[in-house]
UniProtKB/Swiss-Prot annotation:
It comes from Synechococcus sp. (strain JA-3-3Ab). This is Translation initiation factor IF-2. InterPro entries: EF-G-like_DII, IF2_II, IF2_N, P-loop_NTPase, Small_GTP-bd, T_Tr_GTP-bd_dom, TF_IF2_bacterial-like, TIF_IF2. GO terms for molecular function: GTP binding; GTPase activity; translation initiation factor activity. Residues 581-584 are annotated as: G3. CDD domains: IF2_eIF5B, IF2_mtIF2_II, mtIF2_IVc. The gene is infB. Residues 184-200, 286-299 have a biased composition (Pro residues).
Length: 1031
């Protein structure tokens, strides 16, 4: 098959088109599929010989365009050009004319003399196939300058094939009278003609052009090349042909014979309109100087009456490749045509150079396109151009569209300089760091996000991310870094890290203003009872108040802060003391700190039999941070085994030296049960208060601190407030933290309603919109709008703090994430905490943070005071959470909802039990671990050979030996085998186990290299519940 020849190679060799080669193959009966098909050498020779003979050139090649010669005024022989051009035998019919007139038009066109074609060689093979056989080479570009005159199609020659129509359309050199029919002159350069011919020409040529494509292969070739100029007489009737559809989509219809177009001139016009190429060609005379084949214009006028009546002045475009030399397309509307005619008149007197410039300027105009005859575009490109021109009907659209596009381009260019500036914002901190001569010092106050750290270090976020990436930590811009990781990054970037001194939580706040100095009056002291758990704080307070609060407390421990008033007779006067009772459990650190912050005097209670304990030292640190005087009450001196002197010694070691030892710390030995020395304690409190000269201004809006708060199902949010300055009255508008409220009612610690509360008064307040946070400060405002604005600002700040806290839960550190957490095996336990008061919720959350969370992480979805409601149950069911109720109850329907949805609700009244159960639940989430449990040991005393190996005669040293248990054989301290014990016999009987002190035979299938003295360790693997690693 290597000697076979491809058809396109033959076409290239012969200098012809593939289509011509395919036609020859079809004529010779040579089978083929496409131009890439192969044929035998013999068949190739036949094709070459056939191609070398004169052949009919089909008008399907639109790309070959003979160039017009502006100088030639005489007819030129269209020998090859004629063949190359598609002879468009279209009889232009202005109006529906009878078939006889169409036939007459066809005869006139055929008999029409063409002075330009005397040299043409044309031979008519028949009426059906009247096509011209050109003897010249197949390439039609040989005679580009020769512009064939417009060929007139012969109706008789019209056939279904466009080739036959093209052949028949080519007029013979017979000198038929031109007056009978307006002949479409070849490319007549009628630029010299007056402005009138151009005006009429576009009108008359449009119908003719539109008709021309229909009869002969209009579809095969967009003959835009030739520009035919019609006589003025023919052009005048043309204005009637105005609205042929310009859409090029109708071009495929021209395949129909010429007779069909003659039958309906209107339909022909519609078909012709899609071919904007024809219209462009007809405008040629005014725009391009084309050689005039027929110099006498009067001849054209007599042609009309002789050959065709005025009703049918449609010029017959014999030559299919009529170039749209004057592509002055007449639009469908009459107004557009008038505008085009005016434009033609203005351009008629311009020079050739001006025409070229105007053509470039008017490319966007669909109306006029001036083409220079010397610059002839290819037929394909011209066809595409003409197809696009009619689509842009509004002449102003293209130009109006282009300027905005051009204007849009500079805009992005102008914006581009801004983008670098925007992107430079990321690197701006670096530049600022370089320009600032400040020291590279980072004040690290806690965990930071990557973005915040980059801003403080004045570097780009990408620099931080890159530095961490090299450390093996992948972070995002919003991820939170712990202090150690942020410190390492800062040091690597050359910064010195400093940490601010931690401000104590119990630091006392100043509530007096300068304007209060002139209105100060003495106020009662606020005394906070502090100490370790079970040292008798509440019992001591009950003994002072003559109450029994301690007996009503769950578990006998205080788990909430309380405020009480006590009236004492001192030096013949009634003196009031406000006591704050704080819990002693380690989880209630915040409560103790809050009590120390608002107190005036701290009473440190220490049990004489227990001495100084951790919470004693913590309370001491809070009191010192608040810089308040300390009074030590050594309690339980009546208890056997009490050692008050040892307690004083311990306190002295921590900086509290008793007054009797030469110190400045008052110490009173008391007994709450026997009420011993209680008066001495109260007297000491009042003496210290007098020394401190406690004062306040009662004639100002109240200010103070929220001691405790809770949600009451009947009364709503209830807050215990300590008024530290000013006077609080019913009806006042106040802001407590971020909560707005109006005082609806006030009650003291005994439940009596009050209308006002002065300085150092502890009251329960009703009327707040929400439950405030314990420890928040409150202030009364005269303007409610101002109060609401302040509350909203604080609420927004609180939301941001919560968001920061949520980010902290996703913080990244180098050592806090365990390997299992990195592998996605970190367990999570979701919790919903409901307590009686807000302080208890805070204490529980603080205690949860102390639990180890490297393998099981605790997520507190909600922690708030109040009852357990159905909403809480729904949240727990949706998030698979556990509800922890602390000293609270169920709302109506909540317990039933929890049972229906299977929500686990745990109720507690002692914080110890809550934390113990929570730790157990966390351990339950851990996967149990397998541990080795030893069973016994045996020593090999004798090796007994058997047929299948050897058996170890052993003596059980300790424990027991079980069959199928795991064994480890040690020889001189090294393990020589580890596997399973398969056979265990005592004498000749199989036994399940052998106890210590007995002999037995041990056999293992996969091991028989026993030696005397080997030690056999018997053990088993058991699963054991894991416990949380210490934090």
């Amino acid at each position: 098959m290597t000697d076979r020849v491809r058809l396109y190679e033959i076409a290239r060799e012969m200098g012809c088109d593939n289509r011509e080669v395919l036609e020859v193959c079809e004529q010779l009966g040579i089978p083929f599929k496409s131009h890439s098909s192969t044929i035998s050498p013999e068949q190739a020779e036949l094709v070459r010989s056939k191609l070398s003979e004169p052949r009919v050139v089909k008008p399907t090649r639109p790309r070959l365009r003979p160039k017009l010669q502006p100088e030639s005024s005489q007819p030129q022989p269209p020998v090859e050009a004629k063949a190359s051009e598609r002879p468009q035998h279209i009889v232009g019919i202005r109006r529906p004319a009878p078939a006889q007139q169409q036939a007459a038009a066809g005869e006139a066109s055929s008999s029409k003399p063409s002075p330009q074609r005397p040299d043409q060689l044309s031979s008519e093979k028949g009426a059906a196939g009247g096509s011209l056989e050109l003897i010249g080479p197949p390439r039609r570009q040989v005679d580009p300058p020769a512009r064939p005159a417009a060929q007139e199609p012969q109706p008789a020659a019209a056939s279904t094939r466009p080739e036959a129509a093209a052949k028949a359309g080519s007029p013979e050199p017979s000198p038929a009278p031109a007056a009978k029919r307006p002949t479409v002159l070849p490319p007549p350069r009628r630029a010299a003609s007056g402005p009138e011919p151009p005006q009429r020409a576009p009108e008359s040529r449009r119908p003719g052009l539109a008709e021309a494509p229909s009869p002969s292969g209009a579809r095969t070739s967009p003959p835009v090349e030739e520009k035919v100029s019609l006589p003025q007489a023919e052009q005048r009737p043309r204005p009637q042909l105005v609205g042929a559809p310009v859409r090029p989509g109708t071009r495929p219809e021209p395949r129909s014979p010429v007779a069909k177009k003659e039958e309906s001139s209107d339909s022909g016009k519609a078909d012709e309109a899609p071919r904007p190429q024809r219209r462009l060609e007809l405008v040629g005379p005014p725009t391009r100087p084309v050689a005039k084949p027929l110099p006498p214009e009067p001849d054209a006028s007599p042609r009309l009456p002789e050959g065709i009546p005025e009703e049918r002045p449609t010029p017959v475009l014999a030559e299919a490749p009529v170039r749209p030399a004057a592509p002055k397309l007449k639009r469908k509307t009459v107004e557009e045509e008038d505008e085009e005619l005016q434009a033609l008149e203005r351009r008629a007197g311009r020079t050739q150079a001006k025409r070229k410039r105007s053509r470039r300027r008017e490319e966007g105009d669909g109306d006029v396109l001036d083409l220079d005859p010397l610059t002839v575009l290819s037929s394909v490109k011209q066809a595409e151009l003409n197809a696009l021109k009619p689509l842009a009907r509004p002449t102003a659209k293209p130009p109006s569209y282009r300027p905005p596009a051009a204007a849009a381009r500079p805009r992005p260019a102008a914006e581009r300089p801004q983008r670098p500036s925007a992107s430079a914002e990321a690197t701006a901190p670096e530049a600022a760091a370089e320009s600032l001569p400040e020291e590279k010092v980072l004040l690290l106050e806690g965990s930071l996000t990557v973005q915040e750290l980059a801003r403080r270090l004045r570097v780009a976020e990408t620099e931080i991310i890159k530095t961490l990436f090299f450390k093996g930590v992948r972070v995002t811009i919003n991820q939170v870094l712990d202090e150690s990781l942020a410190e390492s990054v800062a040091k690597e970037l050359g910064y010195e890290v400093r940490r601010p001194e931690a401000e104590p939580k119990a630091k006392k706040t100043e509530i007096l203003d300068l304007e209060d100095i002139d209105h100060l009056v003495p106020r009662p002291p606020v005394v906070t009872i502090m100490g370790h758990v079970d040292h008798g704080k509440t019992t001591l307070l009950d003994a002072i108040r003559h109450t029994n609060v301690a007996q009503r407390e769950a578990g006998g421990i205080t788990q909430r802060i309380g405020a009480y008033h006590v009236d004492v007779d001192f030096e013949g006067q009634k003196r009031r003391i406000v006591f704050l009772d704080t819990p002693g459990h380690q989880a209630f650190t915040a409560m103790r700190a809050r009590g120390a912050r608002v107190t005036d005097i701290a009473v440190l209670v220490v049990a004489a039999d227990d001495g100084v304990q951790p919470q004693t030292l913590e309370a001491l640190s809070h009191a010192r941070a608040a810089q308040v005087p300390i009074i030590v009450a050594i309690n339980k001196i009546d208890k056997p085994g009490s050692q008050p002197e040892r307690v004083k010694q311990q306190l002295a070691e921590h900086g509290l030296l008793p007054e009797e030892w030469g110190g400045d710390t008052p110490m009173v030995e008391v007994s709450a049960l026997t009420r011993r020395n209680l008066d001495a304690l109260l007297e000491m409190i009042l003496l210290v208060a007098d020394v401190a000269e406690l004062q306040a201004n009662p004639n100002r809006p109240a200010r103070g601190t929220v001691i405790e708060a809770h949600l009451d199902k009947a009364r709503g949010p209830v807050a215990t407030l300590l008024v530290q300055n000013g006077t609080l009255r019913v009806g006042d508008t106040l802001v407590a933290g971020a909560v707005l409220g109006r005082v609806k009612a006030m009650m003291d610690d005994r439940g009596q309603r009050l209308q006002e509360a002065g300085p150092s008064s502890a009251v329960q307040l009703l009327g707040l919109e929400e439950v405030p946070a314990a420890g928040d400060e409150f202030q009364v405002y005269a303007d409610e709008k101002e109060a609401r604005r302040i509350a909203e600002e604080r609420a927004e700040a609180l939301r941001q703090a919560r968001l920061q806290q949520a980010l902290l839960s996703r913080r990244v550190s180098l050592g806090s994430i365990s390997a299992k957490a990195q592998e996605g095996q970190l367990k999570e336990l979701n919790l919903i905490i409901k307590t009686d008061v807000q302080g208890s919720a805070e204490a529980i959350q603080t205690a949860l943070q102390d639990l180890p969370q490297e393998e099981v992480r605790l997520r507190v979805l909600l922690a708030a005071p109040g009852e357990i409601t159905e909403t809480d149950v729904d949240l727990a069911a949706a998030s698979d959470a556990i509800i922890l109720g602390f000293n609270t109850s169920f709302a109506p329907g909540a317990r039933q909802a929890a049972d229906d949805k299977g929500v686990d609700v745990r109720e507690y009244d002692i914080i110890y039990n809550l934390l113990d159960d929570l730790r157990a639940a966390m351990e339950g989430l851990l996967e149990p671990e397998e541990v080795e449990e030893p069973l016994g040991q045996a020593e090999v005393r004798k090796v007994i050979p058997i047929s299948r190996g050897a058996v170890a005669g052993s003596y059980v040293l300790s424990g027991k030996v079980q069959r199928n248990a795991l064994v480890r054989v040690r020889r001189k301290g090294e393990v020589v085998y580890q596997g399973r014990l398969d056979s265990l016999k005592r004498f000749k009987d199989d036994v399940r186990e052998v106890a210590a002190g007995f002999e037995c035979g041990i056999g293992i299938e996969k091991f028989d290299a026993w030696q005397e003295g080997d030690l056999i360790e018997v053990y088993q693997m058991v699963t054991k519940r894991r416990t949380l690693a210490p934090a």
